[in-house]
Amino acid sequence: MFVVFDLDGTLVDSRADIVRATNFALAAGGRAPLPDQVVTSYVGDGARTLMARATGISESDPDLEPALRVFLDYYSAHATDQTRPMTGALALLVTLHRRLPLALCTNKPRRTTERVLRALGMRAFFQAVS
């Protein structure tokens, strides 16, 4: 039995980096930036859905691919610029890790997830990351 956590919004506050990556991708495609609150309301269903919502392009439309690629590349390079642990998250992980196996389940790309976990000192707490 594992205690399973989500990452964004549960263990880390990644909103600022996601907003910045979204608006960077929009600007690269000649679109206007969106307010932070609008972008954060689009978060939670993966990068493809986020960029579809932000651009107004269907998830299945090939025209979404350039914006998605720009977002993913930018976010991968900047995923830890402003991302921080949620208040109390590290203390909770320390306490639980002493007694229970922990796992992480996220729709964030694996390489980016690993970078965030390592940068914030969280990777060692998890026996499984998916």
Protein language model regions, located:
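Active-site neighborhood of HAD-like aspartate-dependent phosphohydrolases
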Residues: 1-41
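Conserved hydrophobic/aromatic "anchor" residues
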Residues: 5-7, 71, 100, 126
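Short alpha-helical
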Residues: 17, 46-49, 111-112
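Hydrophobic packing residues within well-ordered alpha-helices of enzyme cores
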Residues: 22, 51, 89, 113-117, ...
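Conserved H-loop
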Residues: 32, 61, 122-127
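A metal-dependent, Asp-based hydrolase signature
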Residues: 41, 45-77, 94-95
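Conserved ABC ATPase "signature" region
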Residues: 73, 118-121
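Short, acidic loop-to-helix structural element flanking the phosphoryl-transfer center
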Residues: 77-104, 110-114
